[in-house]
Amino acid sequence: MTEPTQPNAAQPDAARPNVAPEMDDNKIMTERREKLRELREQGVAYPNDFRPTHHAEDLQSQYEQSDKEALEANPLEVAIAGRMMLKRVMGKASFATVRDGSGQIQFFITPTDVGQETYDAFKKWDMGDIVAARGVLFRTNKGELSVRCTELRLLSKSLRPLPDKFHGLADQEMKYRQRYVDLIVTPETRKTFVARTKAISSIRKFMAEADFMEVETPMLHPIPGGAAAKPFTTHHNALDMQMFLRIAPELYLKRLVVGGFERVFEINRNFRNEGVSVRHNPEFTMIEFYAAYTDYKWLMDFTEQLIRQAAIDALGTATITYQGRELDLAKPFHRLTITQAIQKYAPQYTNEQLADSAFLRTELKKFGVDASQPQFLNAGVGSLQLALFEETAESQLWEPTYIIDYPIEVSPLARASDKVAGITERFELFITGREIANGFSELNDPEDQAARFKKQVDQKEAGDEEAMFYDADYIRALEYGMPPAGGCGIGIDRLVMMLTDSPSIRDVILFPHLRRED
């Protein structure tokens, strides 16, 4: 039997398609289509009768400490399938690196083990082909865990060549547009989305253990509400009515609190017809949760614990690195008012200046903020302070920080403070200079809520496209009585960006929105 000795570094790079480098993709595809035609003639083009018994990563982990002699003494028969990422043909012995959904493992192939006909066929296979093998687990002379193949099959022919292994998808937009290729050739991309799934699973478990019930509320709304944002519109043909893709589930979730479900949450998509940036995607994922008989202080403690646990479950630690800077989620999160944050990062501003509307408008102009925009026409000091905060302090909030005491005029659904006029029991959580969460003690006074909705309508009529509509049914629900409650929304995509050290929201959404291809 041929002794399995791995090729050394001098061997030619087999990661590239086994054709001349100068050949363009069209010629490669023509050759591969011819190979597929031959397979069709043989009646074996796309078989579906192979069932794997093992996964690569499980074998690598379980037998990491097993030496060559131990594997020979207790031979393990395995069946593995995956995509061929490397191929080295060396006369009477060949190697292939095959990657399945868990990881990768090496196949060792000889004509003695698989038969000359199969071996000759294997030599014609290409990088990217989906292959399968049965065989015995062993370790090569150089120590690599491998499968000595006794049966080898081609399950699916790859017609398009994979990108060069050393460069992958160099075009960032192409990574997003052809995510399927990115996932094939970029292990870090796959790790990102595995971490995303783990984080979401952790959140669901955390909520269940806190006695929250997961619910589903409508995606199509007759009236958009729950956030200040511009909605997508559509038309329901059967009902002949305009509908809106939801911008937030908040008002429906609070209807459920009225109905007696005291702790509810939903993880789902929201849609906002706004710009695209490294922080914004028109379609994004959030968790929103509501708990009766709690307030914004309880929410801050709960949200802090939730995020910390999500990091531990997804990454194994609460200490992470984001864009080269360490971030310790195990430490207590900071809490600052809007004015405290401004003065921390822009200490030149005095209390008197921050209480002066005229001064704030003048100062905002220096930052290029047009104070004549509809949302600023009748803005009070609180709104202007918030705008200045966004220009001076927001991007500086690297460590987890709750900004509290938001003005009523920008918080139409939040409960007013009993202690300080003009502000609400609301917070926003910032980490790495980005908003991660928004929560508050809920406004459950139907008359107060109706009055605030009317002010929002006035703002909309004045030209503010993001102002809220008047939702009469929600007011009706509140009139039946809603218990005191707290509610919070957390941006899942931004949270995952932080956990996976991803600079753009597109890096953590499998298929982000892009301009149409020309």
From Swiss-Prot:
Major place of residence: cytoplasm
CDD domains with a match to the protein in the record: LysRS_core, LysRS_N
Cofactor(s) the protein requires to work: Mg(2+)
Classification via Gene3D superfamilies: Bira Bifunctional Protein, Domain 2, Nucleic acid-binding proteins
Keyword Secreted: no
Segments of this protein annotated with the region Disordered: 1-28
Binding positions for Mg(2+) 1 per the UniProt entry: E428, E435
Cofactor note: Binds 3 Mg(2+) ions per subunit.
Location(s), subcellular: Cytoplasm
Family of the protein in this entry: Belongs to the class-II aminoacyl-tRNA synthetase family.
UniProt subunit comment: Homodimer.
Protein name (record): Lysine--tRNA ligase
Gene name of the record: lysS
